[in-house]
Each structure stands twice: as structure tokens, then as C-alpha cells.
């Protein structure tokens, strides 16, 4: 690590500790040339996740957008807020574990539907009606019949 005082390239670590959030490590270093001490921080570099929309447009993944969409589907349903946030946490964790830089919005939509189906069928159908863009009542009816057959 380059010393900010004399620009020497070698230093030794004299103290290391996690920050309060445990997202980085604070290190106190001592320059081996001039003896001055300085602080550095080490953290994992986050690679932003890009979502590829149906029209091909790309935008940054937005946790709040996902949460809002699921909350609309669950409106006036007996689903605790903690459960909805757990769904978003699970999806976000799964996306991070995929180690991809880009993901299709359709893949995220399928992940949401998979989870909502197990939580509340009405919320599932509401989400599906927007996500699958039902154009008429027959498509909506087919989705309901498919859901009933699985039960």
C-alpha cells in the first residue's frame, strides 16, 4: 500500500478490525520508510446487477421496485409485511448467488411467481395478471385453471 506521506510502496498492518456494518475492514498501517501511520479500508467490490427488460432496455436492479410490485399483489391480503420482505430478500440472495452481471426481468418475474404461489394464490394470480400481461379473460381463466389443477 502506497504511503500517503512519503509515497513508499511498503507498509505493515498494525491493527485490523471490522467496521460497524461488517461490510469492510479498517486497517491501520505503518509505513516501513517514514514510520507514519495511516488508515485504509478493504471491502468487496459490488458488481451492479443489470435487469434486461422485455423491450431490451437495461436498468439497474432496484430492490424497492421489486418490493413495491409484490406489495401491490399482496394488497388487502392476510400476508405479513415481514413475509413479503423475506420473499424479496430470498430473491435478492438468489440473484447474487447466480454471479451474473445481467438477468432478464422475466427470470425475476418467474422467481416471484414461484414464491407467491406457495404464500397466497390470490396474490399469485394478481402478480401473474400483470407479469404475463393477460390480454383477455380467456388467458386469465387458463392461468386460474392451471393453478387449480396443480392443487
Swiss-Prot record:
One of its GO terms (biological process) is negative regulation of DNA-templated transcription. Binds 1 zinc ion. Keywords: ATP-binding, DNA-binding, Metal-binding, Nucleotide-binding, Repressor, Transcription, Transcription regulation, Zinc, Zinc-finger. Signal peptide: none annotated. It comes from the Bacteria. A zinc finger (unnamed) spans 3-34. Residues 49-139 form the ATP-cone domain. Its cofactor is Zn(2+). GO terms for molecular function: ATP binding; DNA binding; zinc ion binding. Negatively regulates transcription of bacterial ribonucleotide reductase nrd genes and operons by binding to NrdR-boxes. This is Transcriptional repressor NrdR.
Amino acid at each position: 500500500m502506497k504511503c500517503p506521506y512519503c509515497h513508499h510502496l511498503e507498509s505493515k498492518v498494525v491493527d485490523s478490525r471490522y467496521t460497524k456494518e461488517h461490510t469492510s475492514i479498517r486497517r491501520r498501517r505503518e509505513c516501513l520508510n517514514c514510520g507514519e501511520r495511516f488508515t485504509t479500508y478493504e471491502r468487496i467490490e459490488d458488481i451492479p446487477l443489470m435487469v434486461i427488460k422485455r423491450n431490451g432496455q437495461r436498468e439497474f436492479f432496484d430492490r424497492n421496485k421489486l418490493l413495491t410490485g409484490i406489495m401491490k399483489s399482496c394488497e388487502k391480503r392476510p400476508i405479513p409485511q415481514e413475509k413479503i420482505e423475506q420473499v424479496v430478500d430470498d430473491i435478492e440472495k438468489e440473484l447474487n448467488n447466480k454471479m451474473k452481471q445481467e438477468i432478464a426481468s422475466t427470470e425475476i418475474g418467474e422467481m416471484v411467481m414461484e414464491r407467491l404461489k406457495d404464500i397466497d394464490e390470490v396474490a399469485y394470480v394478481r402478480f401473474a395478471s400483470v407479469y404475463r400481461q393477460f390480454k383477455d379473460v380467456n388467458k386469465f381463466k387458463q392461468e386460474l385453471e392451471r393453478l387449480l389443477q396443480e392443487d
